């Protein structure tokens, strides 16, 4: 079994008042409440999602 690289993301700003697609991206990353943390596989798709909403999240 190979170990995948992971990345932890924390929601640090509320998605209220942002574009609907940005809110959907937040939900797609598994983030719900403010300061919630999600551990995800480090793939180009996930990196693109993080880049899209970089003003809402912090990479730990």
Swiss-Prot record:
Q: Which GO terms describe its cellular component?
A: cytosolic large ribosomal subunit
Record-level GO BP terms: translation
> Which Gene Ontology MF annotations are present?
structural constituent of ribosome
Q: Which Gene3D superfamilies match?
A: Ribosomal protein L30, ferredoxin-like fold domain
* UniProt keywords, alphabetically: Ribonucleoprotein, Ribosomal protein
NCBIfam families in the cross-refs:
rpmD_bact
Q: How does it assemble?
A: Part of the 50S ribosomal subunit.
Family annotation (PANTHER family):
LARGE RIBOSOMAL SUBUNIT PROTEIN UL30M, MITOCHONDRIAL RIBOSOMAL PROTEIN L30
Family assignment from sequence similarity: Belongs to the universal ribosomal protein uL30 family.
The name under which this protein is listed is: Large ribosomal subunit protein uL30
What organism is this sequence from?
Answer: Delftia acidovorans (strain DSM 14801 / SPH-1)
